[in-house]
Amino acid sequence: MEYHHRPHSPPPSDDDVVVIQMNAAAIAAVDEWSSTNEVDDAAAGKGGGLTRRTFSQAYKMKHRTPLEFTWRQVALLSFQSLGVVYGDLGTSPLYVFSSISLDDPGEADFVGILSIILWTFTMICLVKYVFIVLKADDHGEGGTFALYSLLRQHVNFKGNMPVPVTHLASDINLKFHSKKRILTSKLLKFLEQSTKWQAVITYIVLAGTCMVLGDGALTPAISVLSAVQGIQSRSSSITQAHVVLLSVIILFILFFFQKHGTSKVSFTFSPIMILWFTFVAFIGLYNIIKHYPPILKAVSPHYIIIYFIRNKRAAWETLGAIVLCITGAEAMFADLGHFNKSSIQMAFSVIVYPSMILAYAGQAAFLVKNPSKLSTTFYSSTPEPLFWPMFIIATLAAIVASQALISASFSIIRQSIALGCFPRVTMKHTSGKHEGQVYSPEINYFLMVACILITVGFKGGPEIGQAFGVAVIFVMLFTTNLMTVVMLIIWESNIALASLFFVFFFSIEGIYMTSLMNKILQGGWVPFAITAFFLIITLSWTYGRSKKGEYELANVMEREEFIKTVTTRSRVPGVCIFCTDMMNGIPPIVRHYVQHVASLRELMVFVTIRVLPVRTVLPEERFIIDKLEPVGVYRCIVQYGYMDNHNMEGDDYVASVIASLKEIAENDDEILVLDSALINGSTFVLGRTIIKMGTRHNCLKRFFINNLYRFLQKNFRSNMSSLKINPGKTLQVGMLYEI
């Protein structure tokens, strides 16, 4: 059996596209990566000089090669990143100090709190994310899935993973991303042999992803509430109920206009954030000079010790509010794909970092002289002539921060769907220029309802800050764990250095987590509830898909049976596209189909959509074509990256497949047959399977399959819906899988 990559240009070199020919037995072996690489390692270790080809060497793509930017281009990207990346992080001064509860605080307390903020902000945002985590990109893409993608490219994940593994023999040399030779390490071998730890890593990724969705519901609520609360200081007749109502109206309008996209107004986001950073920096500097210039002594960490000695348990409890100063730090990594490392680093170092330090220092200086204003720190510390300009800018900045998290939620769901670990929902592209701008009505309405309920439920109290902090710190803990594995396996860092990274940052984040766990009943349960909701959907979907795959593999239609069945049926002109999740073998639903039809099309193509653990796939690598038996039967694997758009029209798709088949045709007669089949029309056959789990399985498994998975399968879109097939050309074949 031969797999052919569809060419659209002159034959590429070995460094561009891998074209490997393997026999059928090799293709069926899901452990082919592991066994082949072990042989290569053994040979290399004995001095044979054999070195495994790396992922980037074997699967190199021009648009994955890092681009060179001039300093002007980097500066422009830095400016643009302010409105996308730093909205959440930049608006933290709205609510950090006001979320702190402390009895009778004095000068030493505010200096200590500021010292904690300064060092936390510096260590987490600057050192961890800007200097370290940003380097762990997947061909320019960042975020939790990018880290997971890197690991999947280097570690052979086996077994029934929540995120499906799709092995082909042609992938043997497509495994690695690093340009360095991958050494056989004990950790690598351990991970490749331990399905339990592979599952742990995968569950961390899924949980972290779901936690970000919780962040997407909490950020708009706390940002808008904190910005609008300032209006209470203008009139005693304005109550908290009025603030909540105004916040709900703003949030409703924000979510309502998501369907129109942000392309028409996104150009204003960066100017708004520039104004915001300028205002908070100068107001902070003003407060330092006017109220308490010595506040800058907080750079000395010994004031942290003094603060904890003075306040003991109360100091530990305030950490749950102080952690809000680093909300949005994860966005620097998650939004990396929209910019580049240099631009994000420049924007943070030149604008964001100094502005935030001045803002927090100014608020602390103000509180030293006005400790009673702790609950209304932000607006109370704003000079009277600047109140209304600041109120307007703060509200706009809160909307920008909210928009960034909402857009990130859509993007995360899109990546989850692409990797097969979330049921397909409607994804609409809201911009013709920027493919990353997508909108999902289902996710949008869920976030809107959750956000409004959170706003009404918490009413702007300190509990909403505690809930927000839980979501923030857990995502950071997940990143710390994944980064440690990346440092050891991919970067091949010294184990002492990787251990230092893990211990240092896990300790900081762990201390914050212990404080937040104390607040679970006071609001910290909200992000866990949202995470649990999405995680149940994810696990139900992936577990059901894995059981479906197991059944199809166990009941695959044998080659001899298929040939006999096809040759005994009459053939009629046209093309029949069988859509299947299987890349190897004939699924059992085909047996069910041919038993109920009198004739078959002269051209039959089994099509599988496959998502590779890379950001995007070039058009010339989109199709892998294979001839099957008998004559007129083919297999086509359509490859996408997890950030690619599956937006191919049904008719265009058939034409592309036929064009690919013609390129591997052996003679002119075969080309004529293909052209004739295309002219005579096409039919898409989709399987509609229902899985029923028997009583021999436990109640929990039966509930996941017979109830949750069946509900998701019934109410969400099918995997082939992205092909936009004409319903008049579609035939659905139903079949019951009893497992």
UniProtKB/Swiss-Prot annotation:
It is found in: Membrane. Keywords: Ion transport, Membrane, Potassium, Potassium transport, Transmembrane, Transmembrane helix, Transport. InterPro entries: K+_transporter, K_trans_C, K_trans_N. It comes from the Eukaryota. One of its GO terms (cellular component) is membrane. It is a multi-pass membrane protein. GO terms for molecular function: potassium ion transmembrane transporter activity. Residues 1-81, 134-198, 258-268, 340-347, 407-437, 491-494, 541-739 are cytoplasmic. The chain crosses the membrane at residues 82-102, 113-133, 199-219, 237-257, 269-289, 319-339, 348-368, 386-406, 438-458, 470-490, 495-515, 520-540. The keyword Transport applies. Residues 103-112, 220-236, 290-318, 369-385, 459-469, 516-519 are extracellular. GO terms for biological process: potassium ion transport. High-affinity potassium transporter. Belongs to the HAK/KUP transporter (TC 2.A.72.3) family. PANTHER family: OSMOTIC STRESS POTASSIUM TRANSPORTER (PTHR30540), POTASSIUM TRANSPORTER 26 (PTHR30540:SF106). This is Potassium transporter 26.
